[in-house]
Amino acid sequence: GGPNFLPGEHVYAAAREALEKDSGQYGNNRGSDALLDAFLEHIEQIGMTGYGRVNCATGIGAKHVIYNLAEALLDEGDTITFPVPYWTSYLDMAEIVNAKVDLLPCPASQDYKMTPAQLDVALAKKPKVFLFNNPSNPTGMVYTKDEVHALADVLVKYPDTWIITDDIYNRMLFDGLEYTNFVMARAEWRDRGLLIDSLHRPSRRRGGPGGVSARRAGGARAGAASDRL
C-alpha cells in the first residue's frame, strides 16, 4: 500500500497554502466544500454519477471512514462478511463494534479471488454487511470487469445486506490492469452500496491520510446510516 516515491511539489504547496489561510474555525464534519467537490469530480471519472456533497463524508483516512460505517451499520451480534486474505484492520474494527465475522477463504489456487458461488453461500447466512476490497491489499489482486459484474449479480438476491466497497487503490494499477467500479455494477442495490476511496493514496501522502465515503441518495436506509455517522 505504500509507493516508493514521494508526493509531487504541488501537494506540499497546497498543504502550505492551507496552513497559511487557516481560519482557526471548526469546519464541516463531512469535509470542506472544496474537498467534497474534488472527490465528486473523481468519482464521476470512475462512473459514479448522480452524487452530490450530501452523499459524501470524509475522515482521517479510509480506516477512519470504514470504522465509522461499522459503528453506524453494525449492532452487537450482527455479522459482517469479507474475503481472506484481507486488509489487517478489518477484523479488528469488526471486533471493536462486537460484530460477528464470517471469513471467505480465497486461496492462491483461485488467484485470491472470491467466486460468485462463495459469495452466494455467505450472503444466504444473511450478514448485515458485505465488505469488498478491489484492488486488494494485501494481495495486489484486481478483479476483472466480468468478475465484478458476476459478484454484483449475486447481491441482487439479498436486499437486506449493505455493501461496503473499499476501492482506495483504484488509481494505483500497473501492467495494463483496469479497475471496475463495484457500486455502479448493478442499479438494483446501488442505494445500499457505499464506496470507500482515498485522497492521500494517489498523491502518496501516507503521513497525511484522507478517506472519503459516498452513498447514493434516495435510499431511506442509506440515509439512516449516514445520519448515524
Language-model segment annotations:
Residues G1-G61, N68:
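N-terminal small-domain helix-loop-helix segment of the aminotransferase-like
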Residues D78, A99, L155-W162, R190-D191:
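A short helix->loop->beta-strand "cap" motif at the edges of active sites that frequently abuts
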Residues P107-L177:
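Active-site phosphate-binding strand-loop segment of PLP-dependent enzymes
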Residues A72-A94:
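Conserved PLP-anchoring active-site segment centered on the Schiff-base-forming lysine
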Residues G50-C56, E76-T79, K126, R190-G193:
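Short acidic capping loops at alpha-helix termini that bridge into adjacent secondary structure
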Residues V84, K100-A108:
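Short beta->alpha connector loops at strand-helix junctions that form conserved
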Residues A13, R186-L229:
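Conserved core segment of the aminotransferase class I/II
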